Amino acid sequence: MASGPIAGGGVSKTKHKWSDSGNKSQKRSKPTVANSNSLGLEDNHQMMKISLSSISKLEVRNLKRKLQAELEEVRSLIKRLEPQGNNFAPVPNKKLKTANGGKKGGVHGAAADKGTVQILKSCNNLLTKLMKHKSGWIFNTPVDVVTLGLHDYHNIIKEPMDLGTVKTRLSKSLYKSPLEFAEDVRLTFNNAMLYNPVGHDVYHMAEILLNLFEEKWVPLETQYELLIRKQQPVRDIDFHAPVSTNTHNVEALPLPAPTPSLSPPPPPKVVENRTLERAESMTNPVKPAVLPVVPEKLVEEASANRDLTFDEKRQLSEDLQDLPYDKLEAVVQIIKKRTPELSQQDDEIELDIDSLDLETLWELFRFVTEYKESLSKKKEEQGLDSERDAESFHNSVHESNTLVTGLESSKVTELGHVASTVRQEVNVGGSSSSNSSSSGSGSGSSGSDSDSSGHESDTGN
């Protein structure tokens, strides 16, 4: 078999030929070296050639050890040359679905999730309200410097911006985050306030819209910050082994001493310690981490930017129909406030819930909710008042009954005393009359005796 170079080692094997007598040849030749200094580093790619058939087994083992040592040196040198942290295999790139349905230039990073897409939709709604405002028409298009004769405009304003440009960028998903959208909106109004003096109509209009934007931007910014906080732990995942932070209950167990194969199980002290630790963990539960408290008002405003469901709209329509006449005027004013064209019509307005914008719907929803809460509070107060009246009436009746009972008992007591007195008097009178009657009868008997004696005397004579 012909010999050839082997990649990485430069060693080739040749099959030893047997002699005609069947005995293995005892002749051994020294290894042939083409060029000891080349080692494949020169341009002609000359490599070391070693005939394994011509060297002994001991020399083969030594050569193998030498090559392995050189290979380890090469590997260690490669590790030193490579930057730290790049020793992992490259992760294959996966195509991420963009937020705008696969179009190029879409929102990436944190905006790829549904939460950020929903916030950007709310930003689009806010931008539409600014552009439809009665003072927003002047900011909807770029400033026409030539037509207006503003020759010094670009000297003062270094970065022009308008709401129409913001609308275009938002529709093409050129904003990486809602914060960039807010910067361009602020830049539009700040440019107008910078170029126009204080007291100018444009300055006043820009100030009004900027204040309106800042007011409506607060819940969106809060919602975006909450979304970023939720995504932050996912980005900072540590792939190292988890380390327990509850170190006060962990005891270092000593290594078991070498014992015979028939050694008894570990002493029960460890079990007792584990039982005590479990009891302590039951009596002293771990307190959860305190999350940052978001103001309730901001959370309510952030939730108010969502669309109303079909059931909520239906319930709102029914509640509006149940409102009394004095509350309908406030409802009309709420609708006219954001729909100026309705103010020119008659007092009767045909209301279509689906035609109202989101902000008007939420304001009507809050108005109806507050009215229902106030109505329930009044009913509760009336119920408490009626209960208090009934209780006071019951107490007064109880007191009057107690008073009457006391009077009756006192009268009964007095009557008892009178009856007992009468009985005593009756008893005394009866005894005296009986005595007198008995004495009378005695006298009568004596009289009869005297009469009888007299009669006898007369008879004797």
From Swiss-Prot:
Sorted alphabetically, the keyword list is: Bromodomain, Chloroplast, Chromatin regulator, Plastid, Transcription, Transcription regulation, Transit peptide, Ubl conjugation
Q: Does the keyword Membrane apply?
A: no
FT transit peptide: 1-51
What GO molecular functions are on record for this protein? Answer: histone binding
Q: Where is the composition biased (Low complexity)?
A: 429-451
Show where the Bromo domain sits: 114-220
An example Gene Ontology cellular component term from the record?
A: chloroplast
Compositional bias (Polar residues): 393-412
Biological process (GO), any one:
chromatin organization
Cell compartment(s), UniProt: Plastid, Chloroplast
Give the domain note: The NET domain could serve as an interface to localize different proteins or complexes to chromatin.
Q: Subunit arrangement?
A: Interacts with SIZ1 (via PHD domain).
Q: Per its database record, what is this protein's job?
A: Probable transcription factor that binds to acetylated histone H3.
Q: What is this protein called?
A: Transcription factor GTE3, chloroplastic
Q: Which organism is it from?
A: Arabidopsis thaliana
